[in-house]
A protein has these predicted regions:
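Conserved beta-strand/loop elements of the cytosolic catalytic core of P-type E1-E2 ATPases, chiefly
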Residues: 68, 74, 104, 182-185, ...
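Helix-interface capping motifs at the ends of transmembrane segments in multi-pass membrane proteins
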Residues: 43-63, 217-255, 268, 272-278, ...
């Protein structure tokens, strides 16, 4: 099979477009702009601008008009940036397909398929495009996505037209096939009925619900205070214009429009940063759950190991071990030939490839050259072995070649107890060396047709194959980091008990692991299983239903579970876990769809990196929301001050816009880029019930904001006593307010560090320099000052207004840290290093 050439495929892709459905939820910038123009902050600015125009203040109206453009530009930048991150994730989450190109079977993005491509699909795959079958073996397809019928239907070439076709989006539940693509993208049956594939899930998350509650609470308080201030100002002071401006300013100062923006930006950019670590987030709740994971269940092959199988040992029925680099005797060659016939020469399975690599070098002729393939028998829970049926050309009878778990193949061969014990002891000895062990057997039959099942055939034991799959170099360090973070690592593998034990020791999961076989779990009730899980970290010969039961038992015990999987039957366990982790390289489409996270490199260390990133995102999101609560207190206080003191308005809508120019970048850029604290992965997992903001945090933020307002008030009172003009007093109070804003950013960035932000957060320093430069222009230069309703102040007064709040808050931060160190006896508690072992 040659398939299309790469150049022809590229030409057809240019002509027909990508194999993708439209994405109705994708937001381009005009749609984003329309949503920005409906923001409450913008509507208040427009209202204030119209108000200024109506009373003959065109300069103030123009200034607010310019500020409207600034707010629109900044908000549009944030939203477009988040949307670009989401689009990058959509591109990464696009499925892959196996297609013949330039005479070789290749893994290509499904979006690059074109009409005429020859694709190969197997159990667990989503069909990537509409196609006509060329060849198939026991193919059954779930077409419920198109027809609503849940019963899989058989498909085969040569049948009527409908039965010889497969359609995009349907699921292969059994067998395999080769097919020629006949339609792609919107031209498929799926496209014609208007379905959309590949879009990221945007369901509401617990954090989103919490943010909505905060927004509703603060909005209600904002509206109530705005109406109250307008009424009181009008009653006590008179002048509807000032009363209305005071109400609008207070509303702008207190409406919590930053909350939803911060959540959107953090989750989108957090998922994008994870993708750069080769971790694809398919569902937003996974980011929230990652920081709470207490148990990480992992398989072995390709996750803890490199999935780079090499056939290193052949052990025949005579008990003589051989290595492939030796000259093989007749029994070893027969073993190798049988293993090659039981392996897919064009597949992606690393053990199949390893067998064929040795067979092509060791066997005198092409193994399958004289054989016609008739049927294959996939692995099932009842028989963990793979077999194929072959007919030798020009000769009667059939050959059945089988390879699989030694126990299953031994039972298939009907070995006597003594022989069975011997071969299983050989398998255990090989497994104890860390080898992946498969048994090989064959059967000859005179029947003309391949049998429906293998159980009634007379199989002959041929021997054992030992595959070396080296442990990934970074796994021991990643396991140690997980243990230090209070995350227990549990190994669930289908491998031999001794292989599981050897890998667990090498990876550092446990020094002396107690290994339990999957079959033993079937004899345990819920209480016994819970007791077993409390002391066991390694499970061998585990089937998918065992994984599901283990995950459910861990959840029932109160653990937050992350689970890795790659097969069709792993989907229930992946969905049952709080965080399902599918393999992007070797995983099936079904597993990827069931999972909330996909590892693009199938690497265990990536899971631990994702846990670290999840903790970092939540910690930074918590910092940002606490800062939002704190920073609005001094702004609201300065907006209320004239009403309490009977002085002219200090804060105007334009001033609040300037403050928003500080608050929004601080939330969406500075906090989002704050690196993890050094001890983040030495702390226990965050309880899943931990809210983003609890009452204690809100009270602390309000108190911190009140302290900042007290400093602003102090500067204002000193300036008033210095007999400065009211616009100069307002300028100094505004300066102190902006500096307090920056100080609050720094305060919340790293509470465990000193009073000055760490040098790693470049975004903070850029924001600081830019804001202070603009602030100096607004308060020291005549023209900009007039636009803001100020009169320029002296340089010493400006420096005093900058230094007083900055030094006061930095000093308070330093004192609090000293008091904490005195109050805490000894170091901050960390998770014991042997946790999980």
């Amino acid at each position: 099979m040659s398939g299309l050439s790469a150049s022809e495929a590229a030409q057809r892709l240019t002509r027909d477009g990508p194999n993708a459905q439209p994405q109705p939820d994708q937001r381009h910038w005009p749609r984003i702009l329309a949503s920005v123009l409906r923001e409450p902050m913008l509507l208040l600015l427009i209202a204030a601008s119209v108000l200024y125009l109506s009373v003959g203040e065109p300069r103030d109206a123009a200034a607010l008009g310019l500020s409207v453009l600034l707010v629109v530009g900044l908000t549009l930048y944030q939203e477009v940036r988040a949307e670009h991150a989401l689009q990058a994730l959509r591109d990464l989450s696009s499925p892959w397909a196996s297609a013949w190109r330039d005479g070789a079977l290749q893994r290509v993005p499904a979006t690059s398929l074109v009409v005429g491509d020859v694709v190969q699909v197997a159990e667990g795959d989503r069909v990537p495009a509409d196609a006509k079958l060329l060849d198939s073996s026991d193919l059954h397809v779930d077409e419920s996505l198109l027809t609503g019928e849940s019963v899989p239907v058989a498909r085969a070439p040569g049948a009527d037209d409908a039965a010889a076709r497969i359609h995009a989006g349907t699921l292969v539940v059994r067998g395999q096939a080769m097919a020629e693509v006949t339609a792609t993208g919107s031209g498929t049956e799926m496209g014609r009925i208007g379905a959309s594939l590949g879009a990221l899930n945007r369901e509401a998350t617990p954090l989103q619900h919490e943010i909505r509650r905060l927004v509703l609470w603060f909005t209600a308080a904002s509206i109530a205070s705005c109406v109250l201030v307008f009424g009181l100002y009008l009653t006590l002071r008179g002048g509807w214009l000032d009363a209305l401006l005071a109400g609008i300013t207070l509303a702008m100062a207190t409406i919590p429009e930053e909350f939803p923006v911060v959540l959107t930006v953090f989750l989108a950019l957090g998922a994008w940063r994870m993708a750069r670590l080769r971790v694809l987030v398919r569902r937003p709740p996974a980011i929230e759950a990652l920081g709470s994971v207490t148990v990480l269940c992992t398989d072995k092959t390709g996750t803890l190991t490199e999935n780079r199988m090499a056939l290193t040992q052949l052990l025949t029925g005579g008990g003589m071990p051989h290595t492939p680099d030796q000259e093989l005797d007749g029994d070893s060659l027969s073993l190798l030939r049988c293993a090659a016939l039981a392996s897919d020469a064009n597949g992606f399975d690393p053990m199949d490839r390893a067998v064929h690599a040795v067979a092509s070098a060791s066997l005198p002729e092409s193994t399958a050259a004289d054989w016609e393939h008739l049927k294959h028998y996939p692995v099932t829970p009842a028989l963990p072995a793979y077999a194929t049926a072959w007919r030798r050309k020009h000769q009667p009878g059939l050959l059945l070649a089988c390879k699989g778990a030694p126990e299953a193949v031994a039972a298939l061969c009907g070995l006597a107890d003594e022989d069975r014990s011997r071969v299983l002891a050989d398998a255990a000895s090989m497994a104890a060396e860390g080898l992946r062990v498969l048994a090989v057997a064959d059967a000859h039959t005179t029947n003309a047709d391949a049998p429906d099942s293998l159980e009634n055939e007379a199989f002959t034991w041929r021997g054992l194959l030992g595959f070396a799959d080296p442990l990934r170099a970074e796994v021991p360090a990643a396991v140690a980091e997980a243990h230090a973070a209070g995350v227990r690592v549990v190994l669930m593998t289908g491998d031999h008990i001794e292989t599981a034990r050897a890998i667990a020791i090498a990876a550092g999961i446990s020094d002396h692991p107690e290994v339990t076989l999957g079959a033993a779990l079937e004899q345990l009730d819920a209480d016994a299983l819970r007791a077993l899980l409390a002391r066991t970290d390694v499970f061998a010969r585990v089937r998918p239903e065992h994984k599901l039961r283990l995950v459910q038992a861990l959840r029932d015990a109160g653990e937050v579970v992350a689970m890795t999987g790659d097969g069709v039957n792993d989907a229930p366990a992946l969905m049952a876990a709080h965080v399902g982790v599918a393999m992007g390289g070797r995983g099936t489409d079904v597993a990827r769809e069931a999972a909330s996270i996909v590892l693009l490199d199938d690497d265990f260390a990536s899971v631990v990196r994702a846990i670290r990133m999840g903790r970092t995102i939540f910690a930074n999101l918590q910092r940002a929301t606490r800062y939002i609560v704190a920073v609005h207190v001094p702004i609201a206080g300065l907006a209320l001050l004239p009403l309490l003191l009977g002085t002219p308005l200090i804060l105007l809508p334009l001033h609040v816009v300037f403050l928003e120019m500080v608050i929004d970048p601080a939330c969406s850029i500075v906090f989002e880029r704050e690196p993890a604290e050094p001890d983040l992965m030495r702390r226990p997992p965050r309880p899943a019930s931990t809210p983003l903001l609890d009452l204690r945090m809100i009270a602390a933020s309000l108190l911190l904001g009140a302290s900042a307002f007290a400093l602003v008030l102090l500067v204002y009172m000193i300036a008033s006593r210095a007999a400065l003009a009211p616009p100069q007093t307002a300028a100094l109070a505004f300066t102190a307010l902006v500096v307090c804003n920056i100080a609050l950013v720094q305060w919340h960035l790293a509470p465990s560090r000193s009073g000055i932000a760490g040098p790693t957060n470049v975004a903070f320093w850029i924001t600081l320099v830019a804001v202070l430069a603009l602030l100096a222009c607004l308060t020291l230069l005549s023209a900009p000052a007039q636009w803001f309703g100020f009169i320029p102040v002296s340089l010493p007064a400006f420096f005093a207004a900058v230094a007083a709040p900055a030094l006061s808050l930095a000093g308070a931060h330093w004192i609090i840290r000293r008091l904490r160190k005195v109050r805490v006896a000894g170091p901050v508690p960390t998770v014991p290093q042997d946790a999980g072992g």
